[in-house]
Amino acid sequence: MAAHDDDMNRGIRPGRGSEDPAGQVAYLEQEIAVLRRKLAESPRHTRILEERIVELQTNLAGVSAQNERLAGTLREARDQIVALKEEVDRLAQPPAGFGVFLQANEDGTADIFTGGRKLRVNVSPSVELDELRRGQEVMLNEALNVVEAMEYESVGDIVTLKEILEDGERALVLGHTDEERVVRLAEPLRGLTIRPGDALLLEPRSGYVYEVVPKSEVEELVLEEVPDIGYEQIGGLGGQIEMIRDAVELPYLYPDLFREHELRPPKGVLLYGPPGCGKTLIAKAVANSLAKKVAEVTGQAAGKSFFLNIKGPELLNKYVGETERQIRLVFQRAREKASEGTPVIVFFDEMESLFRTRGSGVSSDVENTIVPQLLAEIDGVEGLQNVVVIGASNREDMIDPAILRPGRLDVKIKIERPDAEAAKDIFGKYLTERLPLHSDDLAEHEKDKSATVSSMIQTAVEQMYAESEENRFLEVTYANGDKEVLYFKDFNSGAMIENIVGRAKKMAIKDFLDKNQKGLRVSHLLQACVDEFKENEDLPNTTNPDDWARISGKKGERIVYIRTLVTGKQGADTGRSIDTVANTGQYL
């Protein structure tokens, strides 16, 4: 056995070439044992190798991800370096200047204005020279060459246009201290209709004006749109409407007949009367009706007229001459509109606030210059064609007589307080069949809405105009000792009727919400009349008794004493006397 091991150690396989079968068998058994041992160890070795492979693959994936992160970091660093370089280059560039383009030259250069100097510079190929316009802002490089076209200037000083010069490219303007200056018209103003008096935006360094700036102080006072109120929406003033239509519409619609009869159309109309009776409504309806008549005469689908609504008190200005200037601007605009053949209505509301009697001593005497300005505009050297002046006032006695004389405000129309018939007409404008009516009121008239509404109006008017104890308002004492009782009907107005209907509608809504009873009832109207009268109870407290004479139409005798006769809702007499007080209150 020892010999066999020695043979093995020497690399000699025992039994090979030996003729001893037993030795060969032993050798083979040893080989089999070795192979079996190796075969048993092979899976474990394979598993170790596989685990090693997995570990290496994991390490490889981690290294690859790390490489990707490093590559991404390098790319970001490179981008940041490039961006920083660009930022450094950008910050290192010299500043770019701006200038105003004046004109292009035949050699491809351009004349610009910059830094108070007029320069001739080159233009970058990236800028289309033919597309540059006069007054346009351009960007300049350090060599003062044009490298980019910009927008027009949008800020500057406000100047007033005096006139356009003959070349059509320059204008004479007035600054804020009334100094005159000749400026250039920028391209946006070329071809536009600009009028003397318009406010323009001036860039003072280059001397260009760029745009027309709306004049807020005049635009707020003037309403050019035609109101959408028609004569059919006005109740109880049929006679007055016919008079104003004859005065305003006929001269424009039939000018040949007026020339044939050598009849001069009226220049102005005065609407006077108590407040709330429809003076402003009529003036608005005149413009609307005139536009429709123009459409009929010209055959156009939609006629055109202008309604310049002048808010009288807002024209007053603390600076001397400003009010007169604004009046001139108003009539200048009216003449421009009328020169196109379009009728223009200039409406002065609350006319007595502007054109009071001169020398009356009841104001700051600004009317000493305002009234002559209006007179010069109405019938001065520069006449008015296709322009009608309409004034509205509830104190016509305070207007200067020179304005009211024939040839200026030729037609004077008094807007009376509504009588019973007129009140029915006014009620019919606000109380219509479209409104929800209560079933009980409808049942009394066999579900006839028209009959129900007519009955409600009749009942309300009868209560308003009844000379009953509940409707007594004032007892006036005249200077000759006579006394007269005035009722609420003597102070009724269209505005009051509208308010009464509004109160009744609100009562109907509250009844529906509280009692689930839907519809307007006659009781709502009657209660609304009582509430309206009750609210007017205290109005005489701040009124001069002389004003009541003008309101009631009894101007022949002076009122020296007034006593209220209002009966409260609980039946208590709340009558009291009112002595003569200063003329401070609003006029009923």
Curated annotation (Swiss-Prot):
Single GO MF descriptor: ATP binding
Keyword set, alphabetical order: ATP-binding, Chaperone, Coiled coil, Nucleotide-binding, Proteasome
Coiled-coil regions, chain positions: 47-94
Pathway(s) it belongs to: Protein degradation; proteasomal Pup-dependent pathway
Basic and acidic residues bias locations: 1-10
Biological process, per Gene Ontology: modification-dependent protein catabolic process; proteasomal protein catabolic process
SUPFAM superfamilies for the chain: P-loop containing nucleoside triphosphate hydrolases
Chain positions covered by the region annotation Docks into pockets in the proteasome alpha-ring: 587-588
Complex and partners: Homohexamer. Assembles into a hexameric ring structure that caps the 20S proteasome core. Strongly interacts with the prokaryotic ubiquitin-like protein Pup through a hydrophobic interface; the interacting region of ARC lies in its N-terminal coiled-coil domain. There is one Pup binding site per ARC hexamer ring. Upon ATP-binding, the C-terminus of ARC interacts with the alpha-rings of the proteasome core, possibly by binding to the intersubunit pockets.
PANTHER family (alphabetical): AAA-FAMILY ATPASE, PROTEASOME-ASSOCIATED ATPASE
Domain note: Consists of three main regions, an N-terminal coiled-coil domain that binds to protein Pup and functions as a docking station, an interdomain involved in ARC hexamerization, and a C-terminal ATPase domain of the AAA type.
Stated role: ATPase which is responsible for recognizing, binding, unfolding and translocation of pupylated proteins into the bacterial 20S proteasome core particle. May be essential for opening the gate of the 20S proteasome via an interaction with its C-terminus, thereby allowing substrate entry and access to the site of proteolysis. Thus, the C-termini of the proteasomal ATPase may function like a 'key in a lock' to induce gate opening and therefore regulate proteolysis.
Protein name according to UniProt: Proteasome-associated ATPase
Organism from which the protein derives: Streptomyces coelicolor (strain ATCC BAA-471 / A3(2) / M145)
